[in-house]
Swiss-Prot record:
HAMAP family: Ribosomal_uS10. This is Small ribosomal subunit protein uS10. The keyword Ribosomal protein applies. It comes from the Bacteria. Involved in the binding of tRNA to the ribosomes. GO terms for molecular function: structural constituent of ribosome; tRNA binding. It comes from Mycolicibacterium paratuberculosis (strain ATCC BAA-968 / K-10) (Mycobacterium paratuberculosis). Belongs to the universal ribosomal protein uS10 family. Part of the 30S ribosomal subunit.
């Protein structure tokens, strides 16, 4: 697989879970002998939702909730078959969304 590249994008709401998952992926790739670039922190997506506190009136009294989506990018350069096999077997938390390209 010379000259190839695997790009892994991680998304999660919890920054500690995504950092631990990225660290685990990098350790696995380095242990199998491939070179790795990253984890590169991508911009955090912030969604703000405005909700009226009262069920009937008092529109001036509002509450804001936000959801932050943290993202990381990891590039694996010149992966070996051993690297791909190790990545398939790695156990990551369910709260982390993994997209492999």
């Amino acid at each position: 697989m010379a000259g190839q590249k695997i790009r892994i994008r991680l998304k999660a709401y919890d920054h500690e879970a995504i950092d631990a998952s990225a660290r685990k992926i990098v350790e696995t790739v380095v242990r199998t002998g491939a070179s790795v670039v990253g984890p590169v922190p991508l911009p955090t997506e912030k969604n703000v939702y405005c909700v009226i506190r009262s069920p009937h009136k008092y529109k001036d009294s509002r509450e804001h909730f936000e959801m932050r989506t943290h993202k990381r990018l990891i590039d694996i350069l010149d992966p070996t078959p051993k690297t791909v096999d190790a990545l398939m077997r790695i156990d990551l938390p369910a709260s982390v969304d993994v997209n492999i390209q």
